[in-house]
Amino acid sequence: MAALSKSIPHNCYEIGHTWHPSCRVSFLQITGGALEESLKIYAPLYLIAAILRKRKLDYYLHKLLPEILQSASFLTANGALYMAFFCILRKILGKFYSWTPGFGAALPASYVAILIERKSRRGLLTIYMANLATETLFRMGVARGTITTLRNGEVLLFCITAAMYMFFFRCKDGLKGFTFSALRFIVGKEEIPTHSFSPEAAYAKVEQKREQHEEKPGRMNMIGLVRKFVDSICKHGPRHRCCKHYEDNCISYCIKGFIRMFSVGYLIQCCLRIPSAFRHLFTQPSRLLSLFYNKENFQLGAFLGSFVSIYKGTSCFLRWIRNLDDELHAIIAGFLAGISMMFYKSTTISMYLASKLVETMYFKGIEAGKVPYFPHADTIIYSISTAICFQAAVMEVQTLRPSYWKFLLRLTKGKFAVMNRKVLDVFGTGASKHFQDFIPRLDPRYTTVTPELPTEFS
């Protein structure tokens, strides 16, 4: 690891804004590019969100544009202020240290930028960046040999996270809001211990509707016969008295859960691939067919379907074994269900859910009075996390998540890739590992060190 005290004498033009010697011009160019990309990102995002949430006309007339501009200003400021503090730190310190091009410049820039964003969005941004920073630090540790990778580590992390999430889901007031609604959609309300209605009453209503349907005169078609046959199979079979899936036996309950969530996962992955498929509709029509039989479609479907079926099957099995329904069953069922990630391995999903779990447990600790509340914690965590990611983007881009690196390139119109990283190689992080062929054309009138000479510590 590079020593923090070591430095190099180069100026900000030689390392940072190699495309123009003027700090002011470079700042304005970064600002303009970042603003353009920010508007391209947030305008459709907020518009689609407003349509899905069925916002009223008043929102479109008075709130939509200000929210778009506020979020775009936040993202623009994050990129532009990084460039500003990059130059300011060089002028103040007189040289570059290993931490100044990335962490040092990004920390104050991120702190000021996040204050521009709406408070309601800061928490989500903080979770995302904290997740990304943790993943980046892990990769840094692996690259340095200080951390040993664990085979299928993301699956194990997901198993532990799923176990805790399902336990909180089963507990009264364990989860609230979107998280509770999402899990209820995935595993079904049958796994919630308490319901707002009596299960027996619901079962009676179902039976009553079924009888009324059967009393209707008319010729029974083939679909009706098949449906009646399937219902009879699902209805007759083993079901423990503690199980609340009154319309199915335990076996059909698990099978139906798998089919339902497999379909959801398959359709989600198809929808995600639609934009890219339609871009090649006229040039490569055959790619449209691949939209439906792509391998990832079935992988996500198998992941979600097996998660639900394993969770439900384990829960039913434990109810049969112990002859009772217990919230602790959710820990075992959730952990075993987490193995389903073998079908769709994703470090991003595991890390994000683990981060959200830590956040949930932290706020539960605050409510219980066992954990202190830190004001402005989201702002501070966001700033530090973003600074860590920028440090990686400058000094060792190979440890940064590829999707975030592409985002930085888009935000800066590709200028993040034209930094003079060969000069930074002296710090020992392999800064130019993926930029071996790039040599900036610098104007000798504005340089402190003659270009192309070996760099030495001062």
UniProtKB/Swiss-Prot annotation:
GO molecular function, one term: lipid transporter activity
Domain of life per record: Eukaryota
One biological process term in Gene Ontology: regulation of mitochondrial fission
Keywords: Membrane, Mitochondrion, Peroxisome, Transmembrane, Transmembrane helix
Cellular compartments annotated: Mitochondrion membrane; Peroxisome membrane
UniProt membrane topology term: Multi-pass membrane protein
The keyword NADP belongs to this UniProt entry's keyword annotation: no
Disulfide bonding pattern of the chain: none
Stretches that traverse the bilayer: 68-88, 96-116, 149-169, 298-318, 331-351, 380-400
GO CC list: lipid droplet; mitochondrial membrane; peroxisomal membrane; peroxisome
Keyword Transmembrane helix: yes
Pfam families in UniProt: Tim17, TMEM135_C_rich
Known function: Involved in mitochondrial metabolism by regulating the balance between mitochondrial fusion and fission. May act as a regulator of mitochondrial fission that promotes DNM1L-dependent fission through activation of DNM1L. May be involved in peroxisome organization.
Family: Belongs to the TMEM135 family.
UniProt name for this protein: Transmembrane protein 135
Organism taxonomic ancestry: Eukaryota, Metazoa, Chordata, Craniata, Vertebrata
